């Protein structure tokens, strides 16, 4: 079965995690995000994959090659100009070659049963089948309104509360039939949610929504990335760690000469390899701080232990560690973990 992996985004909202690397190469459990997606595809029978690239596409090609190390046949389509989500898929028409195709975004972590989504699409006869997920945070996402049979009647893009009529979130994972691809204009930017899906609905085409169980999270910001790391460590997200990613029960704590009130136990250093926060020098966080309000300066690594924070003394800025006055629990609580 064929799949298209959309991996052309720059990941500007995910900075500083994506400084110096494209978003698909940002690591989760010691393995690039795109590697986890390729493994998910392979597990569910999608072994023929085309990745759409734009920003630093050469880095991604060098990292994954022909895909054989990941158990798939991997090829690439490099965009010289942004084509949007649907336009980028249309650019892969030769790869699709008139078949049904799975579309998956490089912006999310999930462990969905993609084979079940494929079967639901084939059974429905729809032009497009959309993977839906119930969410308690509907304002952050595009929503799909379905009838009792699962047929999608409308889409609502990031609504405000008065317009929230469903909690079914569009996860950005689709199965497209050839007639859906035919409806995408070639050679220009075109978007699934804003253009293709409304056009298909207006023409009377059937779009099916399949509600999937399992984990799904958009990884668009450092906070969502950090939450995803915690979920993976605590078993809510099923991922296979990289070979070099391991933790010892005897993980050492912070050196005493940092002068901080720290207690780094268990998986603290492990979590430190996953998520770096950049916080102001000389700051007092006893009242808590939001991630978006932090200035980028000193490297602070949050601990997997909820009441502990570890300073990365290997950082070039480590000599400034004593200028910090931290209430460790306040920092963790401010992240709403």
Where are these regions (language model features)?
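A structural signal for short hydrophobic beta-strand segments in well-ordered beta-sheet cores
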Residues: 25, 144-146, 197, 209, ...
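N-terminal glycine-rich phosphate-binding loop and ensuing alpha1 helix
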Residues: 1-61, 269
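Well-ordered alpha-helical segments embedded in enzymatic catalytic cores
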Residues: 33-36, 88-91, 196
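Catalytic-core segments of class I nucleotidyltransferases/pyrophosphorylases
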Residues: 100-102, 109, 115-122, 136-138, ...
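Structural beta-sheet core signal
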Residues: 5, 51, 103, 128-131, ...
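Conserved beta-loop-beta/alpha segment of the NTase-like Rossmann-fold superfamily
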Residues: 60-148, 183-185
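Phosphate-binding and adjacent anionic-ligand microenvironments
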Residues: 243-337
């Amino acid at each position: 079965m064929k799949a298209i992996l959309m991996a052309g985004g720059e990941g500007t909202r995910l900075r500083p995690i994506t400084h110096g690397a494209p978003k698909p190469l940002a690591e989760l459990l010691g393995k690039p995000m795109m590697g986890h997606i390729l493994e998910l595809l392979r597990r569910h029978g999608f072994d023929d994959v085309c990745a759409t690239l734009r920003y630093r596409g050469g880095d991604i090609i060098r990292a994954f090659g022909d895909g054989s190390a990941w158990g798939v046949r991997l090829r690439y389509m490099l965009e010289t100009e942004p084509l949007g989500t649907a336009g980028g898929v249309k650019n892969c028409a030769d790869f699709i070659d008139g078949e049904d195709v799975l579309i998956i975004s490089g912006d999310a972590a999930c462990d969905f049963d993609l084979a079940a989504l494929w079967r639901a699409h084939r059974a429905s006869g729809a032009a497009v089948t959309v993977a839906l997920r119930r969410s308690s945070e509907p304002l952050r996402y595009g929503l799909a309104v379905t009838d009792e049979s699962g047929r999608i009647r409308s889409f609502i893009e990031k609504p405000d509360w008065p317009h929230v009529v469903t909690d079914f979130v569009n996860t950005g994972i689709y199965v497209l039939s050839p007639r859906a691809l035919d409806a995408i204009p070639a050679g220009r930017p075109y978007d699934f949610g804003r253009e293709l899906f409304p056009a298909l609905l207006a023409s009377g085409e059937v779009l099916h929504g399949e509600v999937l169980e399992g984990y799904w999270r958009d990884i668009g910001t450092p906070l969502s990335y950090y939450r995803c790391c915690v979920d993976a460590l605590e078993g809510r997200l099923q991922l296979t760690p990289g070979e070099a990613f391991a933790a010892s029960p005897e993980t050492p704590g912070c050196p005493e000469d940092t002068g901080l009130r720290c207690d780094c136990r268990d998986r603290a250093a492990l979590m430190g390899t996953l998520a770096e926060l950049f916080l102001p020098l000389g700051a007092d966080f006893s009242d808590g701080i939001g991630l978006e309000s932090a200035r980028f300066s000193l490297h602070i690594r949050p601990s997997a232990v909820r009441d502990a924070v570890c300073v990365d003394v290997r950082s070039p800025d480590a000599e400034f560690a004593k200028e910090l006055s931290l209430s460790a629990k306040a920092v963790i609580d401010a992240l709403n973990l």
